Amino acid sequence: MAVEYFQEKLNKWRYSPVAGSPDEEGGNATVKPKASFVPVYAGLTIISLITVTVSLVHLLSGTGTTTTFPPCKNPAVRREWRSLTSSEKQNFTQAVICLASIPSTWQPNGTIYDDFAILHGGIGSWCHRSASFLPWHRYTLVVFEKALREHCGFTGQVPYWDWTLDWMNLANSSIFNSVDGFGGDGDRTGQEVVGGGRCVIDGPFAGLQPILYNHTYVRHCIARGFRDGDQAGRISGEYYRPESIGGILRKQSYVELVREVEIYLHNPLHQGVNGDFLAMTAANDPLFYVHHAQLDRLWWRWQQESPDLRLKEYHGKHMYNSTGNATLDDILMYGGFAEDIPVSRVMDTKGGFLCYTY
């Protein structure tokens, strides 16, 4: 019964519109798969959802770990996409394409790249609207970066997209360049594929074929459908004004910060890009990683303002369905795809367990 419950939840989940926005009432696109598809009951997200069911049993009993790590000596530096050289950009995009060709070692279908979307659509869905939103995604980026290195010879770090540089016209950002970016909007002359999106036909990721959209097995192209209210082809940048970011970073408590980062910075881009980006399997679109790296960077900036306090500040409810207050001993779960770890290990990006900066 629990698995069916999680399936139903995952199928219905969409990124929540910002309160008071034009999208608040019924603004999320519905799934309209046009490719051939079958239910996923044969084993795809069932694996991750069963993992959630089992893992939730020990969710609230932290390990009480006292493991400490010395500060890293030479932290890697994550950089903004535009600051990378052409060869560095190609190193990243080719590694992503490579990962989408490596058979999964976690489930019988798809690739390791698909595994990340399944992970996010399963366990990751329970980390939204909760304290674990930022630390869970922080470590997911590290695991993704490690996979790119180990399987595909990636030599850099996951870059971030600073959308404040593009807030006046997000859809025209160089991140969507077809030559050295992520490709642009979906083909407006094509048919709708998933999530109100159409196939991306330009850029390095035009050939990717993810296998899942939410809980439905549907091999499809990467789909996007830029929309700002009634205007197709646009993405609202109102929430990405530099002054808006500054206001969020001035929040004094972690509870306030994580809530506003998710609602006002995370969700609007998912709603504006649409397609794959609209669902909990948003990691189908490589844009997911540079978007979340920017969110992680903002958390890092907030922590650096008062490191003695904020490198240990973790409050709220640990996961979406948790009761009680979150603690640093709470576990970030990855269902065997990566090591389950206490939150404390990822609070400091230069704490030894992690070793990077921005």
Curated annotation (Swiss-Prot):
Binding site for Cu cation A: H128, H137
Cofactor note: Binds 2 copper ions per subunit.
InterPro entries for the chain: Di-copper_centre_dom_sf, Tyrosinase/Hemocyanin, Tyrosinase_Cu-bd
Effect of disrupting the coding gene: Decreases the production of ustiloxin B.
Catalysis performed (reactions): 2 L-dopa + O2 = 2 L-dopaquinone + 2 H2O; L-tyrosine + O2 = L-dopaquinone + H2O
Gene3D superfamilies in the record: Di-copper center containing domain from catechol oxidase
Keywords: Copper, Glycoprotein, Membrane, Metal-binding, Monooxygenase, Oxidoreductase, Transmembrane, Transmembrane helix
Protein's cellular compartments: Membrane
PROSITE patterns on file: TYROSINASE_1, TYROSINASE_2
Pfam families for the chain: Tyrosinase
Domain of life: Eukaryota
Family annotation (SUPFAM superfamilies): Di-copper centre-containing domain
EC number: 1.14.18.1
Keyword Glycoprotein: yes
General function of this protein: Tyrosinase; part of the gene cluster that mediates the biosynthesis of the secondary metabolite ustiloxin B, an antimitotic tetrapeptide. First, ustA is processed by the subtilisin-like endoprotease Kex2 that is outside the ustiloxin B gene cluster, at the C-terminal side of Arg-Lys, after transfer to Golgi apparatus through the endoplasmic reticulum (ER). Cleavage by KEX2 generates 16 peptides YAIG-I to YAIG-XVI.
Family: Belongs to the tyrosinase family.
Name of the protein in question: Tyrosinase ustQ
Species: Aspergillus flavus (strain ATCC 200026 / FGSC A1120 / IAM 13836 / NRRL 3357 / JCM 12722 / SRRC 167)
Taxonomic classification: Eukaryota, Fungi, Dikarya, Ascomycota, Pezizomycotina
Gene that this sequence comes from: ustQ
